């Protein structure tokens, strides 16, 4: 099936170079030419074998559409075919995942082959310099830019574009790839090498499966040596639906860490991640990783995490409130969560906060393959009105409060019940992580604040002014991480 990748209705003749222009770019004849996303109508030439193939297939998502997030399709070369001398990519737009395009061209084209990119510049794309990033990605994958506009473009009206690149004779040191499901075992080997413990297939699926995340890898001599991953996070930014790319599983093989340069595998994968999945990003990096990323111009700090810890309180029942353990099998519980989430969202219309509806809580906590969390509603004993939700995890000696879903005014009551549960469970304390700009809401019930040396970055690689809107605006807790 052919998919419509353009966001603008244009005639194919407006954006395609002429057959004679393409023939002029052929390295040698006889030659093979692929019209990727175009038709062979009118393409007849001596000594040239011309084929056509769809650029992508309907619903073959490299980035699944969801709420505020637009879908991006995976480019797919024919499984069987020759090593083409020229590939003309028709109707290229942000609807096509550029790394899926270039990683296949890098593998399938012979040295000296030419790639011609054609299309119409989109109106108001998420990444304003989208086409520049597509070309830069091609260069990182081993292609040299021959002409920014394909020579004489007098016959091609603006905003149409043509970009011409040629594959280098020598392959780049690192092969860059969009991660696909079959790559999980090799990435797991890198994870073990870097972190010293394995990542299970189930945990990998929980993070990245079913369109929940994406990643970029760099390989050398067939082995994955770097990985830059992220999970999609639906957020409310000043009360409006948005999405951000939550960075996780940033890995570089120990033998490659000496190449921490602007052409090294870490920066290559991180830059591609920012250019494809930007401009809004965040994460919870280790201090050393944050320092390196700042020096390379990838990250800038927009906040940091702190810990608040409380002593247990009296275990007696509270006269005004009671507790209710939530269940995924009760629809009333789902509606309860969604209701208090709407109240919380209304209190945070001047902030940035990840969605905390039932669908999110179920996926984040109840679907986790290894950790056990308890989702507990605090309810008015007299009216039955839900006041908020606690997400708790019992540890060896304490209780972690990973998340709250509640209007701000209910936080003291929820924290009191969390302290009571710590006493009932025989734990010495209860604690939470919260962004420092929100900690004043938690300094109740005798809470004691300490720093945890975790900065919150924003992605500044693309120099997009939207990246700075998060400064001292995030509401993040330890449940927002992928590792707690």
Residue spans of the language-model regions?
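Conserved alpha-helix/loop element of class I SAM-dependent methyltransferases that forms part
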Residues: 11-31, 42
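Amide-forming acyltransferase catalytic core, primarily the GNAT-like/NAT-type
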Residues: 26, 183-229, 237, 276-277, ...
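Class I SAM-dependent methyltransferase SAM/SAH-binding core
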Residues: 35, 39-76
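A short acidic, Gly/Pro-enriched loop at the edge of an enzyme's catalytic core
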Residues: 76-87
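A short glycine-rich, Lys/Arg-flanked "PGG" loop and its adjoining helix->strand segment in the class I
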Residues: 99-114
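Core SAM-dependent methyltransferase catalytic element
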Residues: 141-143, 150-173
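Active-site/acyl-donor-binding loops of N-acyltransferases
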Residues: 232, 279-327, 374, 382, ...
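Conserved acetyl-CoA-binding loop-helix of GNAT-fold acetyltransferases
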Residues: 249-252, 257-275, 409-421
């Amino acid at each position: 099936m052919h998919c419509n990748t353009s966001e603008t209705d244009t005639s194919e003749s407006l954006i395609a170079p002429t057959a004679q222009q393409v023939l002029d770019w052929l390295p040698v004849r006889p030659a093979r030419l692929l019209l990727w996303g175009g038709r062979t109508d009118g393409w007849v030439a001596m000594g040239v074998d011309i084929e056509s193939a769809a650029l992508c297939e309907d619903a073959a998502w490299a980035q699944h559409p969801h709420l505020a997030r637009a879908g991006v399709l995976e480019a797919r070369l024919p499984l069987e075919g020759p090593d083409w001398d020229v590939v003309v990519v028709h109707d290229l737009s942000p609807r096509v995942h550029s790394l899926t395009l270039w990683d296949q061209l890098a593998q399938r084209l012979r040295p000296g082959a030419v790639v011609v990119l054609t299309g119409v510049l989109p109106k108001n794309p998420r990444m304003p310099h989208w086409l520049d990033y597509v070309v830069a990605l091609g260069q990182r994958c081993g292609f040299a830019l021959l002409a920014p506009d394909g020579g004489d473009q007098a016959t091609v009206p603006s905003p149409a574009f043509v970009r011409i690149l040629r594959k280098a004779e020598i392959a780049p040191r690192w092969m860059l790839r969009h991660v696909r499901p079959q790559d999980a075992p090799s990435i797991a080997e890198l994870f073990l090498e870097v972190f010293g413990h394995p990542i299970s297939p189930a945990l990998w699926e929980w993070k990245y499966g079913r369109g929940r995340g994406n990643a970029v890898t760099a390989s050398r001599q067939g082995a994955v040596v770097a990985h830059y991953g992220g999970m999609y996070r639906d957020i409310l930014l000043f009360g409006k639906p948005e999405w951000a790319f939550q960075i996780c599983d940033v890995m570089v093989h120990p033998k490659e860490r000496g190449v921490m340069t602007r052409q090294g595998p870490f920066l290559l994968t991180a830059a591609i991640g920012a250019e494809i999945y930007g401009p809004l990003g965040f994460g919870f990096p280790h201090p050393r990783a944050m320092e390196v990323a700042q020096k390379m111009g990838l990250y800038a700090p927009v906040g940091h995490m702190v810990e608040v810890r409380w002593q247990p309180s009296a275990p007696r029942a509270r006269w005004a409130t009671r507790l209710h353990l939530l269940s995924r099998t009760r629809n009333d519980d789902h509606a309860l969560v969604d209701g208090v989430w709407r109240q919380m969202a209304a209190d945070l219309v001047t902030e940035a906060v990840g969605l905390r509806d039932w669908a999110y809580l179920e996926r984040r906590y109840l679907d986790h393959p290894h950790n056990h969390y308890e989702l507990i509603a605090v309810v008015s004993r007299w009216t039955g009105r839900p006041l908020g939700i606690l997400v708790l995890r019992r540890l060896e000696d304490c209780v972690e409060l990973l998340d709250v879903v509640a209007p701000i005014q209910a936080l003291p009551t929820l924290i009191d019940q969390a302290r009571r549960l710590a006493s009932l469970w025989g734990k010495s304390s209860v604690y939470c992580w919260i962004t420092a700009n929100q900690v004043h809401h938690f300094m109740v019930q005798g809470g004691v604040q300490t720093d945890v040396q975790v900065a919150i970055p924003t992605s500044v690689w693309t120099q997009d002014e939207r990246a700075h809107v998060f400064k001292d605006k995030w509401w993040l807790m330890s449940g927002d991480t992928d590792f707690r």
